[in-house]
Amino acid sequence: MSDAFKPLLSRLADGATLSDDDADAFFSACLRGEPTPAQVGAALTAMRMRGETLGEIAACARAMRRAAIHLEPPFPTIDVCGTGGDGLHTLNISTAVGFVAAGGGLKVAKHGNRAMSSKSGTADVLGELGVNIAAPPEKQLQALDEAGICFLFAPAHHSAMRHVSPIRAELGFRTIFNLLGPLTNPAGAQRQVVGVFAERWVKPLAQALGMLGSEKAWVVHGAGLDELTTTGETSVAEFSDGKVRLFTITPEAVGLRRAALADITGGSPAENAQALRRLLAGETGAYRDIVALNAAAAFLVADKVETLREGVELAGRVLDEGRAQAALERLVEITAP
């Protein structure tokens, strides 16, 4: 069976790009464990050295979506997540944003994993907060409905990745799969705020989300962070109405102070969980500001507000009124084993 992939690998080695059909077929085969580890590693390496194309990214995402264990909520959802890999070890921003967005009335299907290159991934800090990250689908749906947020643990929903995960770990460098977490939400979130680890991926991932059927999405990179940032300027690609629009955002433009990276640097999962608890309890400062900015983007993408500044103000009210904290508490209650 593995001999069937040799012609494709030869083309990749010569620098060719894969057609949509070839890419879809190859990645689907990878998720079934058909190519040998050496063949998967060779393909990933060739694509990384040449530069992954938009078609290859979309095809790989489609293959992952088909192989996923899906959650099917009866209402529209939004996801707020990043690719990770920025290497800056910040506090958990998108995790906190999920609770603020839920407290503001959105239904947040938060897709995430344990830390890969950071010290504290979404799953790590949620575990410290008392959330059962292994909650069954019926509990996830209940949490979405009643708490406004659920957590979709990537390994549980993308079990087919077990065929490629050891290969990725052995390679030790970024591959196309590092871009795919935000493109493969198991609940089929049609609206998203996606952070990417490098600015060059802002526009391509927005285009990919459009190809994959998103209604509206922001793909962002902020001064080295896979988030909107208060430490500098954020580059944004908005997909909406079938088009991609590029623009930049500064914190001052929405009434926020510029911060230093040191002000939002995190630590262990336990330390980041404590910081998140203090934030939800009303603590002000740089962490609150960057969370409010990212939550504002979620509110805007979900058409909850008309401007980013209005979104920042709504995020502040949600935090001050304890609604984000209530979302966390209800999520913990519902997912308890």
Swiss-Prot record:
5-phospho-alpha-D-ribose 1-diphosphate binds at residues 82, 85-86, 90, 92-95, 110-118, 122. Its EC number is 2.4.2.18. Gene3D superfamilies: Nucleoside phosphorylase/phosphoribosyltransferase catalytic domain, Transferase, Pyrimidine Nucleoside Phosphorylase, Chain C. GO terms for cellular component: cytosol. One of its GO terms (molecular function) is anthranilate phosphoribosyltransferase activity. Mg(2+) 2 binds at D226, E227. NCBIfam families: trpD. Homodimer. Belongs to the anthranilate phosphoribosyltransferase family. This is Anthranilate phosphoribosyltransferase. The lineage of its organism: Bacteria, Pseudomonadati, Pseudomonadota, Alphaproteobacteria, Caulobacterales.
